[in-house]
């Protein structure tokens, strides 16, 4: 009799323990993936893998605060290459990826929260190169380097400019500096950070041809309530000036 009572008490204790652990944890958690895309998201040590507090940048700071306010659990990992992390977020429930451009052709692939940043699309040339462009049509006469899987490279490919796509955008710095390409299609201010990391200067803007906003893209299975809660908190952060303050920390 006493043994049965003892076992029953153990069972009740286990149930209470499980309940307490559940109450202490956020009811929903996500796996967030990103890449080196300064100043929006980047590894503190500049390498191609980082986790949690070793990831820096405007968007990384904004996303962390947004999830904290929304009381949604998350892990954050920076990996390489970009098309791999993009594919994981596209295919795996509970995953998200940032920072990515919200293009019309991507609209129905994800659920979106943002914007978490904005940037310009530019064509760079060497400062000693007399290239001067007034349209993308003129750029077709030149060798253009771009980043594989990036919105800029995708758009130029669609337009028939046939950019040479690199797995690492930083490789385009070397190629432009050495004359292997004539133009580098890249984001501004992204290129300024990458060039500084490589210790290279001597580039100029040959054409500024678009502006775009950056988002957190969530797997389509993400509950609408989670998306709405994140967006509500981001909107509140923007109204408070929190997002502008985050941007100013990296200028």
Question: Where is each model-derived feature located?
Answer:
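Extracytoplasmic small-molecule ligand-binding "clamshell" domains
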Residues: 23-101, 108-109, 146
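Periplasmic-binding protein-like
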Residues: 34-37, 119-122, 194-231
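Extended ligand-binding regions for polar small-molecule ligands
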Residues: 57-69, 216-250
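Short helices/loops that flank or line small-molecule/ion binding pockets
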Residues: 68-69, 78-79, 83-95, 111, ...
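A ligand-binding cleft/hinge motif common to bilobed small-molecule-binding domains
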Residues: 90, 100-108, 182-210
């Amino acid at each position: 009799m006493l043994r049965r009572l003892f076992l029953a008490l153990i069972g009740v204790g286990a149930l209470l323990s499980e309940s307490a652990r559940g109450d202490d944890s956020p009811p929903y958690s996500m796996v967030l993936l990103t890449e080196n895309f300064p100043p929006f998201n980047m590894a503190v040590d500049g390498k191609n893998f980082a986790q949690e507090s070793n990831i820096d940048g405007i968007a990384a700071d904004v996303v962390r605060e947004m999830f904290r306010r929304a009381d949604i659990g998350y892990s954050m990992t920076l990996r390489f290459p970009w098309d791999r992390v993009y594919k994981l977020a596209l295919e795996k429930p509970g995953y998200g990826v940032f920072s990515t451009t919200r293009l019309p052709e991507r609209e129905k692939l994800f659920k979106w929260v943002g914007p978490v940043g904005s940037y310009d699309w530019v064509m760079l040339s060497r400062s000693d190169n007399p290239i001067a462009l007034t349209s993308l049509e003129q750029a077709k006469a030149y060798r253009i380097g771009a980043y594989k899987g990036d919105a800029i490279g995708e758009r130029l490919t669609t337009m028939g400019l046939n950019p040479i796509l690199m797995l690492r955008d930083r490789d385009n710095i070397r190629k432009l500096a050495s004359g292997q390409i004539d133009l580098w299609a890249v984001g501004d201010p992204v290129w300024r950070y990458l060039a500084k990391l490589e210790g290279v200067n001597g580039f100029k803007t040959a054409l500024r041809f678009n502006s775009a906003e950056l988002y957190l893209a969530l797997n389509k299975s993400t509950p609408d309530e989670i998306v709405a809660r994140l967006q509500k908190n981001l909107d509140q952060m923007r109204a408070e000036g929190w997002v502008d303050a985050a941007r100013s920390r990296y200028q």
